Amino acid sequence: MLDALHLPGMTRGNVQVFTRVSTVTNTQWLTWQKPRGVSMLQAIVIGGGGGGGGGFTRAAAAAGGGGGGGGSSAVTRITIPAVCVPDQLFIQVGAGGQGVGSGGGTAGSGVLSYICIAPDTAAANTLAVSGAAAAVGGGTGTGAAVGAAGTAGTIATIGAMPLAGLGQFAFIAGQIGIAGGAVAGAAGGAQTIPVTSVLTTGGAGGAGTTSADFAGGGFTAITASLLSEARPATPAAGTVAGSGGFLLGPPRYPLFSFGGCGGSAANATAGGAGGNGGPGSGGGGGGAGTTGGRGGDGGGGLVIICAW
């Protein structure tokens, strides 16, 4: 059989996926063992997404803002000759931030993910880290203001992962979450599918209300886009939770993670909860109501190591 373009055969690769998360840096390490006979490795490193803020709890016909969606993690990718790395690497997968309910303040931030040559995240040990700053959670709505959008995770720097100089590396910033719907009453802010090459998305905003029901935020449609066709469904108005995010992948889709949709707002009943984010993506904000909806949790991180 001819070797087309001198590329390795499809059956010769080794792919390991790490998803068990750690809530505290430098604890709960996982290990990767170098497979026999490989010459190259590539890794995708994604941290935890930010949680969604809660919708405001208020009496019927009173003003209340929706919760803000959490930001998404930045993404780091490295490609290194296998001969340049030890036979064992240590992996930490960062947890997603927890969503909060009404009055809970800013939702939890995500935790960074790491690949290290020893079970310690000191820069001298680090082959790859998902970013410089983790994704931040969204803010909680009040009677006077909407919940703020959660800040996106920022790109890593080579100074924080100097061993990546053994190969090639790429850094991609995360996506900001979306603010909650207006206190006068409005649908939650919709999120957009990014065109920056990031694989994660921020969470959408929860709806606000004064005297009517409003839908939580979803994802804006894109014409003739396969990813757009697969996006989470936008919730209906009323006591309706936002759709949860999820991870797409082969054979039909590329690797891509959606954040959670925002919870809907209800004037005379409870607001809907925000949807949880997919891996590395933000949780949706909660909707306002007589009991404000809780924001969704940010998705836990993801580390994939391919060797061939």
Walk through the language-model features, giving the residues of each.
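Glycine-rich, low-complexity segments
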Residues: 1-24, 140-142, 181, 186-194, ...
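Long, low-complexity, polar/charged, intrinsically disordered or flexibly structured peripheral segments
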Residues: 201-278
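Chymotrypsin/trypsin-fold serine protease catalytic domain
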Residues: 159-160, 164-178, 189-197, 205, ...
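Compositionally biased low-complexity segments at domain edges in trafficked proteins
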Residues: 131-180
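Enriched but not universal
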Residues: 1-40, 77, 174, 224-228, ...
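Glycine-rich strand-loop-strand elements at beta-sheet edges
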Residues: 21-35, 45-119, 123, 137-154, ...
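Local beta-strand/beta-hairpin segments that build beta-sheet-rich folds
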Residues: 17-18, 122-128
